[in-house]
């Protein structure tokens, strides 16, 4: 009997999941709440472009068209590339648009008690003879329409981390947005606006941005470029991060080869690998300090008190990658962009009051670029309180960054952070497709839990208080891919000669023929 597999979401992760499992003979259903594909790439601000060089942000078996000559394509070029991929691999007929999944519920027939299982799903294989997922789907265009419930053998969640559930700080009574006479919105809402509408919204307005990661600095730079010194944009943040030129991040990615990974401790490492990391770690420290010194020399960080308190390695370990917008510090120098570091702030009638100043910041519009509640979004899709607790009560990463040891017949793609997220997700989707095809069996639940705890301990060593369970492969992308290749029974060494294997970077091209191997 044919196994029914559902993919929830038609962003990049959902398209990759659908394509790879189709190649294994499955006929998946893809539920997409919106009317188009692309996920976050379908809703971006006008100045958005790739932060990752396109050689690291491409499908392994579908190259960028020759017409895209830029190293960092813009959002329109990325969307065209994603659409071309979906058309080329005939994914679009599998997608049911405007179908919002409101909840998923695991139903186990018989007298089994799955929390007591030793093996994932009771067998260690992807499908169970007794377990099914009930997926409740609502028409996104008509909330009053009757819901539909689909019974499925396996579910792949590709709902994305950076959408739908914005993270907005709480404020004391009468000190929040309710007392403010201006407009308050989240960067998600700003990015969803048409470019001309977004431009009209901020034109000749005093705009304040809250945050200091990618969306925050991109929006702040765009507003400052548009409004100039007559209506300066204010950027308020608690923590200074390293924001780097695009070529610097590209160089960092290209330096992540097997040799540099020898400098990093690995989970479950033996004595020789541990000793090698100890002996080579001073070299890693030198590389990092040289990079920090270069950034301090090329950017006026000391002048504007923008030198981060943490090192670049800790930031890289926590998957914070922010590229410096063009002319960012030029806008600061001329006064069209004002930087304000503050641990707290409150709203008042005409603007914001920060803890270090008595005079309010006069503001017409406040944009929160403060991220998303990704764990809560993931938790909310489950009907079972047990599965909800599995998501929220542990900081351990997922096994192979896509399998929760306690949640059977389900995978999560696109939740892992990475400097090259498409590349990372594609490798996991290939792994998942092989698993669904019955090519290998998962370890016991205890073994998977022990494995992810080792990863957690290892990454906390580098990221410390900035550790996130969604970020475990930033320093060890090749090592992670080696594990995936070994699980699938493939040779992890993809280069043709030894020096390239040691010192050349690994890119999606290196895994181009992986899915063709049996």
PLM regions: where:
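Flavin (primarily FAD) cofactor-binding/catalytic cores of flavoenzymes
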Residues: 2-47, 70-242, 246-247, 251, ...
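Long alpha-helical segments found as membrane-embedded helices
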Residues: 452-460, 471-472
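N-terminal glycine-rich dinucleotide-binding loop that anchors FAD/FMN and/or NAD(P) in oxidoreductases
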Residues: 45-67, 254-263
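Post-kinase regulatory C-tail/linker adjacent to protein kinase catalytic domains
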Residues: 254, 447-455
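A catalytic-pocket lid/entrance helix-loop region that shapes and gates access to the active site
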Residues: 242-272
């Amino acid at each position: 009997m044919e196994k029914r597999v559902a993919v929830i979401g038609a962003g990049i992760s959902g398209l990759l999941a659908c394509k790879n499992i189709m190649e294994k003979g499955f006929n998946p259903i893809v539920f997409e709440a919106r009317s188009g594909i692309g996920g976050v790439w379908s809703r971006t601000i006008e100045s958005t472009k790739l932060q990752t060089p396109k050689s690291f942000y491409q499908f392994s078996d579908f190259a960028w068209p020759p017409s895209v000559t830029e190293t960092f394509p813009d959002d329109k070029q990325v969307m065209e590339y994603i659409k071309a991929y979906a058309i080329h691999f005939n994914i679009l007929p599998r997608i049911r648009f405007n179908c919002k999944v409101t909840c998923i519920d695991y139903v186990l027939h018989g007298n089994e008690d799955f929390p007591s299982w030793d093996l994932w799903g009771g067998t260690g294989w992807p499908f169970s003879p007794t377990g099914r997922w009930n997926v409740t789907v609502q028409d996104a265009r008509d909330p009053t329409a009757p819901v539909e419930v689909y019974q499925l053998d396996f579910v792949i969640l590709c709902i994305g981390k950076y959408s739908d559930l914005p993270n907005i700080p709480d404020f004391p009574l009468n000190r929040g947005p309710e007392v403010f006479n201006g407009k308050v919105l989240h960067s998600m809402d700003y990015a969803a606006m048409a470019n001309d509408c977004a431009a009209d919204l901020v034109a000749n307005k005093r705009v304040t941005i809250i945050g200091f990661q990618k969306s925050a600095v991109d929006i702040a730079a765009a507003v400052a470029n548009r409004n100039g010194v007559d209506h300066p944009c204010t950027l308020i943040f608690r923590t200074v991060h390293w924001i780097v030129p695009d070529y610097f991040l590209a160089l960092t990615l290209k330096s992540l080869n097997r040799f540099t990974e020898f400098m990093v401790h690995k989970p479950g490492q033996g004595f020789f690998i541990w000793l090698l990391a100890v002996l080579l770690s001073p070299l890693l420290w030198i590389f990092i300090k040289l990079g920090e010194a270069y950034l301090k020399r090329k950017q006026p960080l000391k002048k504007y008190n923008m030198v981060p308190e943490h090192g670049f390695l800790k930031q890289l370990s926590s998957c914070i990658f922010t590229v410096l917008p063009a002319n960012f510090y030029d806008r600061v120098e001329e006064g069209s962009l004002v930087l304000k570091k503050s641990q707290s702030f409150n709203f008042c009638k005409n603007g914001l009051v920060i803890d270090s100043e008595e005079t309010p910041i006069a503001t017409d519009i406040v944009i929160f670029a403060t991220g998303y509640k990704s764990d809560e979004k993931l938790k909310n899709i489950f009907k079972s309180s047990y599965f909800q607790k599995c998501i929220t009560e542990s900081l351990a990463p997922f096994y192979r960054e896509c399998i929760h040891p306690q949640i059977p017949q389900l995978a999560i793609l696109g939740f892992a952070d990475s400097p090259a997220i498409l590349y990372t997700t594609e490798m996991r989707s290939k792994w998942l497709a092989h698993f669904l095809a019955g090519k290998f069996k998962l370890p016991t639940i205890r073994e998977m839990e022990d494995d992810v705890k080792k990863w957690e301990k290892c990454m906390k060593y580098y990221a410390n208080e900035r550790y996130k369970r969604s970020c475990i492969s930033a320093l060890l992308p090749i090592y992670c891919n080696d594990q995936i290749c070994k699980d699938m029974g493939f040779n992890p060494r993809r280069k043709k000669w030894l020096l390239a294997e040691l010192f050349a970077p690994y890119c999606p091209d290196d895994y181009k023929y992986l899915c063709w191997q049996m």
